[in-house]
Regions:
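Flexible coil/loop and intrinsically disordered linker positions at secondary-structure junctions
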Residues: 1-137
């Protein structure tokens, strides 16, 4: 059985993305990169599960979504599972792997706009907050 098939089978009943990461990312991305969603729909969407309402990617937000996907995928262990999650999530968003590979770090580039730099900081802070929450006894 290939890793991709195993991932799809286990993703139906197992969360891939940590709940704290989902919720802090939700605070950054809900109604900005994606149309408005309930918290539970966003968690399901992040974990590649069915949602009650369809998820819409906002126009011109693919670049920022790519950075979010990169950042979240780096939190998923093992690394191969993170890569597979990224590919499947991008597909759900209608973003090609070639676009992702080319643009995932653009919000980090020296010439990035102020808005993109702020977005990067927001995503980085969201992941940091989730890590701190998970380390709190």
């Amino acid at each position: 059985m290939s890793d991709g098939i195993l991932f799809k089978d286990t993703s139906e009943w197992m969360d891939t993305v940590d709940l704290a990461i989902c919720m802090f990312i939700y605070d950054v991305c809900n109604d900005c990169q994606f149309g408005h969603l309930s918290g539970s729909d966003f968690v399901n969407f992040m974990n590649l599960k069915p949602t009650v309402r369809p998820v819409t990617v906002r126009p011109k937000e693919n670049l920022r979504i790519c950075y979010m996907v990169l950042s979240v995928s780096l939190t998923i262990k093992p690394r191969e599972r993170g890569k597979q999650w990224a590919e499947d999530f991008l597909q759900r968003c209608g973003i090609s792997k070639s676009y992702y590979d080319k643009h995932r770090n653009d919000v980090c580039a020296q010439g990035a706009t102020r808005e993109n730099r702020e977005y990067r900081k927001s995503i980085d802070n969201a992941i940091q907050k989730a890590r701190q929450l998970n380390c709190t006894p």
